[in-house]
């Protein structure tokens, strides 16, 4: 199993990061992609990817942090992307749910990172919330130039999922699907995601699966819970968990060109 979305730089992991990584591998996780959400976090993610085996990182600016975007951001991302441990540009995209940065700032940063990914021929790791139509408008001109693209933490509708798959995007599914209320629509569309386009992730320390038993004492999510998410996804897709683990591992190897 490969976790394509771990926020290992989070302060929630500051006291026991080594233990968190050890628990993940002990649980059967074979590799992890550590996400960068701004320049500083991307630099930290790279350091952690160098520190732990079978870990890689992304370099980018999240829509929440898009107000920080500057020409220096572009230079920093390019410098990071030239490191072998950095296998994707992002996390980038649009988030019109909270608008911590204005839509204009988000679009500017997203388009700049699409250009970087296309020019460097490196996959792009994307976020989209409450911005589907505008997201596709900005993404579409770049699709032919990008070597690969993943929409991580997908929580949209079946129609939105199909629009992404039709464009060749990989779809990242988190423990959100384990929520008996909020995750129901996502659960119902799982069988319609092509197996060759499915990736799995925890988005730790966020999105702790609500159906873990026994219930954890902490609300902090960990990559060690990835096997639980995989088993639930396999159940709702009607597939064997071992087969699905092998399939999603193969997808991660194909998209990110990683060896684990």
UniProtKB/Swiss-Prot annotation:
PANTHER family: DEOXYRIBONUCLEASE TATDN1, TATD FAMILY DEOXYRIBONUCLEASE. The keyword DNA-binding does not apply. This is 3'-5' ssDNA/RNA exonuclease TatD. Belongs to the metallo-dependent hydrolases superfamily. TatD-type hydrolase family. TatD subfamily. InterPro entries: DNase_TatD-rel_CS (IPR018228), Exonuc_TatD (IPR024918), Metal_Hydrolase (IPR032466), TatD-like (IPR001130), TatD-type_Hydrolase (IPR050891). Keywords: Cytoplasm, Exonuclease, Hydrolase, Magnesium, Metal-binding, Nuclease. It holds the Pfam family TatD_DNase. It comes from Salmonella typhimurium (strain LT2 / SGSC1412 / ATCC 700720). The gene is tatD. One of its GO terms (molecular function) is single-stranded DNA 3'-5' DNA exonuclease activity. It is an enzyme of class 3 (hydrolase). 3'-5' exonuclease that prefers single-stranded DNA and RNA. May play a role in the H(2)O(2)-induced DNA damage repair. One of its GO terms (cellular component) is cytoplasm. Monomer. A divalent metal cation binds at residues 91, 127, 152.
């Amino acid at each position: 199993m490969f976790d394509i979305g771990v926020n290992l730089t989070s302060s929630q992991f500051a006291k026991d990061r080594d233990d968190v990584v050890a628990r993940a591998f002990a649980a059967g996780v074979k590799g992890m992609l550590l996400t960068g959400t701004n320049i500083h976090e991307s630099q930290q993610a790279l350091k952690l990817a160098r520190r732990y085996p079978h870990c890689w990182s992304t370099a980018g600016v999240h829509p929440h942090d898009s107000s920080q975007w500057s020409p220096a951001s572009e230079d920093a991302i390019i410098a990071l992307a030239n490191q072998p441990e950095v296998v994707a540009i992002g996390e980038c995209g649009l988030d019109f749910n909270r608008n911590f940065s204005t839509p204009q700032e988000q679009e500017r940063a997203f388009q700049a990172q699409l250009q970087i990914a296309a020019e460097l021929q490196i996959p792009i790791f994307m976020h989209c919330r409450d911005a589907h139509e505008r997201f596709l408008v900005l993404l579409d001109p770049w699709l032919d130039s990008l070597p690969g693209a993943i929409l991580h933490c997908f929580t949209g509708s079946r129609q939105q999922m199909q629009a992404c798959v039709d464009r060749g995007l990989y779809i990242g599914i988190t423990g959100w699907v384990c929520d008996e209320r909020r995750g129901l629509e996502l659960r119902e569309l799982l069988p319609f995601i092509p197996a060759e386009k499915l990736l799995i992730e925890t988005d730790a320390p966020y999105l702790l699966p609500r159906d873990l038993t026994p219930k954890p004492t902490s609300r902090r999510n960990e990559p060690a819970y990835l096997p639980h998410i995989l088993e639930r996804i396999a159940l709702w897709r009607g597939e064997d968990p071992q087969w699905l683990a092998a399939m999603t591992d193969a997808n991660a190897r194909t998209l990110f060109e990683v060896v684990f």
